[in-house]
């Protein structure tokens, strides 16, 4: 069962999305402020729906700060329609941008598409570079001897890019 962290300061939207996605078999976590997001990501959601306009740190700042911690997809779900806001969202590490009002069915299709891509990425392979060095693309980790090294997303992406173009 996939889990979704829904982050929005509007209780009506939190309640509606929670009910909608629960009825479709998702496990739901919620956050009503930027600060609550930092507490909830420890539960390792499979995907995050993130509003921009929230009390405390806004969604852009939250995304920027958690992007090196989590590798799951982040979909901005916001009333901001300006192109600059969309660009800032993607630059902060967002994977998608949905403008309110939105269709729950379309949002579910986007969530499913992102989770499908994540699932394909997780089924990647391990590559042994020597007796002591193994890169596991599905777990996003490196094993050096008996030590397993978990890297932040950007650092692993750099290692993966370099290893695939050696």
Regions found by a protein language model. Name each.
Residues 30-47:
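Acidic, metal-coordinating helix/loop segments flanking the phosphotransfer/catalytic sites
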Residues 9, 64, 68-129:
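Basic, amphipathic DNA-recognition helix from helix-turn-helix-like DNA-binding domains
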Residues 7-8, 31, 48, 98:
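Conserved sequence signature across two-component system core domains
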Residues 32-33, 58-61:
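Acidic catalytic/metal-coordinating carboxylates
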Residues 15-23:
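Charged docking surfaces used in two-component/phosphorelay signaling
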Residues 41, 49, 60-63, 67:
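Hydrophobic alpha-helical motif in two-component signaling modules
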């Amino acid at each position: 069962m996939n889990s979704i962290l829904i982050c929005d300061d509007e209780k009506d939207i939190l309640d509606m999305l929670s009910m909608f996605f629960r009825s479709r078999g998702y496990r739901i976590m919620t956050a009503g402020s930027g600060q609550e997001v930092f507490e909830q990501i420890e539960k390792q959601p499979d995907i995050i729906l993130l509003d921009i306009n929230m009390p405390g740190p806004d969604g852009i700042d939250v995304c920027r700060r958690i992007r090196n911690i989590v590798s799951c997809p982040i979909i901005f779900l916001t009333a901001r329609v300006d192109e600059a806001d969309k660009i800032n969202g993607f630059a902060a590490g967002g994977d998608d941008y949905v403008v309110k009002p939105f269709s729950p069915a379309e949002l579910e299709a986007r969530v499913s598409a992102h989770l499908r891509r994540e699932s394909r990425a997780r089924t990647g392979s391990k590559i042994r570079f020597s007796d002591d060095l193994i890169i596991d693309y599905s777990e996003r980790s490196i094993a050096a001897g008996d030590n397993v090294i978990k890297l932040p997303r950007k650092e692993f992406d750099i290692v993966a890019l370099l290893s695939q173009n050696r």
